[in-house]
Amino acid sequence: MEPNLLEIPLWRAAVLALVPLLYAGGGAAATVLGQRRGAAAWRVARWSAALALGAALLSLGGLLAGGAALLRGPALVTLGDAGAVHLGLRSDALGGLMLVLISFIGWVIVGYSQPYLDGARGQPRYIRGLMLTLAAVSLLVVSNNLAVMALAWIASSLALHGLLTFFDDRPQALIAAHKKFLASRVADLCLLGGVALVGLQLGTLEIDRAIAAARALPATPGTLQAAALLLATSALLKCAQLPVHGWLIQVMEAPTPVSALLHAGVVNLGGFLLIRVGALVADVPAAQALLVVVGSTTAVVAALVTMTRISIKVSLAWSTCAQMGFMLMQCGLGLHELALLHLVAHSLYKGHAFLAAGGAVAQQRLRQMTPAAPPLSAATWGLGALVGIAVVAAAALAWGLKPAAEPALWAVGGILALALVPLLTGPLLRAGVLGALAGLAGATAVALAYFGLHALFSGWLGSASAGAASPALVAWVLVCFGLLFVVQGAVRVWPRGALARWLYPALFAGLYLDELFTRLTFRLWPARVPAMPGTLAKRPVPQPDMQAPS
């Protein structure tokens, strides 16, 4: 539900505008100071990030004290019947939470980057790209204008491209960045097309006014249905969903802090867009179906592929792909509050996971020192599922959630129940009855916290869970994740069985989807990359009148 927004006080508007300006100023300072004064450039970047975090927290405090509000701002460009491009700023729960999240991640990554890149060439270029990416993302989350949001999203993608190609002598990094560049440009066209259709149909690009105008219509016209499909497609492409997911897996050649920024604060912006303009997509069944089918399929496939990976960073990348699919599926089901909860939790976890990836070897050694758990049986796996379903159902009923009123929410709760099975079976196998009781207590706490946070985020967003999700989509989701649970259980119970041996080659290759997409991208727009060391491209080619050495 779109809240009634008041005019924002001037000081709150100034604090909101200060966040992207601080990041942009830090990027400009890095350009001016250059390589010779790299230490000074890093100091400016750290101070800019710290002040931006402080401004974001101050803005959140103003929001909690004064409520949601906005500043219309002046019209920069008039687009006739499609409205105008306003520098309008919006202070609400969604934008405030995202602004603090982005500023916190930015502050951590800036501090991590300096020692990580110590001695590397091109540090001013890195600082500039990092700060401009943060500036564009922070502008996106505080804007109340669809055109400004679209332009900020495009700017963040272009700035991030410079970070992904920071090591310009690594062919794999350049190939992955090239594939992302092409997918992002297609997504940009979809985004701009969707924004244009919204403006032409509703006569405004201001988000609050556009949503109010759309709700006033007796039925959703074809123009808005096409706009919803374009916006959903843009989000799917930007969030690296199948089959254009390969670049997300292969950008591991980029600096580690860039991977953390990408996975924690940029790739999930598609979810933010769908939450922000959710009312424009929620009444279009085709757009909902697109998000649910593609998102759930990506989540299931990526989760299975993750089981075959040994590399920590590659495993995390496949995990991000799956998590983004799950988030978009929630948006398609109308569960925007759960999608926001998922977005925030994933950002914090994945940012930490990438920055702490260097300690994975020590953690693995500690795990190897612990006694091995007894083998898992099919009966134990099935019993864990039944207990998980009972725990989640009890927690949902304790929060007053009725299955008939909110089937989509209960479907996601069923997925949570299946996800709790390792938490229930692991302690049982390792510590017997006491372990089982500890696992049961932990699962109960997780389920209660999940539905409690759902209620909290629902109140912040001013909306209730969507109970109008198509029964067919709810059934599709349950079948997909039920199949995932069965396959994962079979592989864990019989790791050398026929099913595991049959699935492993295809899953390890990612079902060969990225190979097809890579061929297509290079056929449409070949990339210029340096030859990999040790390849034939580096060796002299004998001429016809010369005899090659024997």
PLM regions and their residue ranges:
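Alpha-helical multi-pass transmembrane bundles of energy-transducing inner-membrane proteins
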Residues: G129-A214, M324-L366
